[in-house]
């Protein structure tokens, strides 16, 4: 190939697009408004759009296949308007939002795909420039025609030296080409920033969760006061608890009616505290206006159904990981074996396991109170008359519980 023409100064006869402004050290997506203004002020960079099957368009066809809906492939026997639209979209290829669809590569005049190494180029020239710098190939390039080749999309692969010189001439920056280590570091930084944005977005979404309304705050206040007034020893249970002697309840010694064995001494201690514990649960329920509005028959059914559950919850939230004990009724600290041999059997394992799980949540009095109210208002108890009403009450406590958790997390 021979050079087609020369300029007056003896430079190659390619069009000379102006390089990017000196004040812009690197093209970035965040500054595209200024970049677009600069680009539009240089009409000599524009040219007619020519549809050719470039590697970019070929890649876009492959990408489009993976985005077809079921309707797109349901009938392949006859063409449709949607099929023509899909085919037309394939031919256009990917165009960044900041780039005009008819923007041309400043090196070869092919269809540009974006800003690469500080210039508007196609994928081919971007890859050529990157490989040349990364592998230090330019010293080995040589031109057969004294460095005067015209570089366009047809001839660009025929002379590497002239193509590289034009890349430099139009302003492509060698310092922006990263080696393997820098490229891996950049990729790692991108992943870290993406993860950071994901966490921030998650925190923002959590921050928008609703908190209690004024009406719910009134309900929360009533339930919390009812719990505090009927919870033995309150928040001072650790200071006031007494440990059951170690020699009590270590081994079952008497056969129980169900076929198991019970330590009578431990059983005697437990029966002494069970009656006041039940009384406190009843008092808690009576302090809730919603409960008092229910028929007496429903009140009895609800209390029979939830009494053991609420007492177990109150014991579970007083689990001490250090001593591995539960404090019953706010006064008696017992081990798992003592509770099991004292008559509770396998139920003791469930209560201890619940206590171990709840200990990591650090529940406050309000959360425990609302959980008790939810257990109390269980509409699935057999024999209830006001099922829908009780279910509505439970939903109110559940919603208040959720909103209070949001409030506590954000405060």
UniProtKB/Swiss-Prot annotation:
Residues 105-179 bind DNA. L-thyroxine binds at residues 280, 329. Residues 242-411 are annotated as: Interaction with NR2F6. GO terms for cellular component: RNA polymerase II transcription regulator complex. The keyword Repressor does not apply. Residues 215-411 form the NR LBD domain. PANTHER family: NUCLEAR HORMONE RECEPTOR, THYROID HORMONE RECEPTOR BETA. Nuclear hormone receptor that can act as a repressor or activator of transcription. High affinity receptor for thyroid hormones, including triiodothyronine and thyroxine. This is Thyroid hormone receptor beta. It comes from Ovis aries (Sheep).
